[in-house]
Amino acid sequence: MASISAKLVKELRDKIGVGMMDAKKALVATEGDMDKAVDFLREKGIAKAAKKSDRVAAEGLADVEMHDNTAAIVEVNSETDFVASNDRFIDLVKEIASQVALEKPADVDAALKLKSPKGTLNDDIIEATQVIGEKISLRRFATLEKGENEHFGSYLHMGGKIAALVLLEGADEETAKDVAMHVAAINPKYVNRDQVPAEVLDHEREVLSKEAEGEGKPANIIEKMVTGRLNKFLAEISLDDQEYVKDPDQTVAKYVASKGGKVKSFIRFEVGEGIEKQTVDFAEEVRKEMGQ
């Protein structure tokens, strides 16, 4: 049997919001596998849904810039929120996004080698790090290309804590911006149901089936329950099926269609998502500084 540490139990409790004994029981039953433990708790009806474990740690800004038929969305990290509001840092983020839209590099390493008035983007980042006094890094970026009768829309929430980029076929830029605002607020995972991978559907169907079985319903009722809950799940993660944030009486797809278009693609960056915050023991830090 796998050894279940207190740290692992706490991680599961923080992730899904269950009691200590339930968390430990689930981890023991699944031999310490975090993902299987989450499913175990959901299937038992102890937890209805798993909360994301992405503890936002890094600060910084995301930005969207466009050049001709290319749009770029970038995330640049700093160590503190204070630096993220620094004008020099803001200008640096915009410069990076603009250069990425212009040059369309293959990856982060290639982006850092792009030419700038002071040398390369990497040189600019190093200089900003030295002047501002905090580590600054280009974490990620993505680009979209538009064709004839296609429109970009972008939206920055809280000055760039969340950035959304949308590509519509048809409609217009104003509609695209409205959809980008929705993407920033609601955080869909896919454009439509057809994009949801089969393994995601199979996994959710299995969990929902076991959850329904645990409620002691007849088989025919269970099938209907699972179908209904699966449809609800798909509507929650598919942009086209979501209730449009500015008019909940219609879906995003219907809103865009009313403007003569359809959603082709979107990208959403939330600063620091997926990066675990480093916790520092202040007393221990002082002891290290004193060489103890």
UniProtKB/Swiss-Prot annotation:
Entry protein name: Elongation factor Ts
GO molecular function, one term: translation elongation factor activity
Subcellular location, record wording: Cytoplasm
Region: Involved in Mg(2+) ion dislocation from EF-Tu, residue numbers: 80-83
CC per GO annotation: cytoplasm
Assigned keywords, A-Z: Cytoplasm, Elongation factor, Protein biosynthesis
Main location (coarse class): cytoplasm
Family: Belongs to the EF-Ts family.
UniProt xrefs under PROSITE patterns: EF_TS_2 (PS01127)
Lineage: Bacteria, Bacillati, Bacillota, Bacilli, Lactobacillales
Source species, domain of life: Bacteria
Pfam families named in the record: EF_TS (PF00889)
Protein purpose: Associates with the EF-Tu.GDP complex and induces the exchange of GDP to GTP. It remains bound to the aminoacyl-tRNA.EF-Tu.GTP complex up to the GTP hydrolysis stage on the ribosome.
Keyword flag Transferase: no
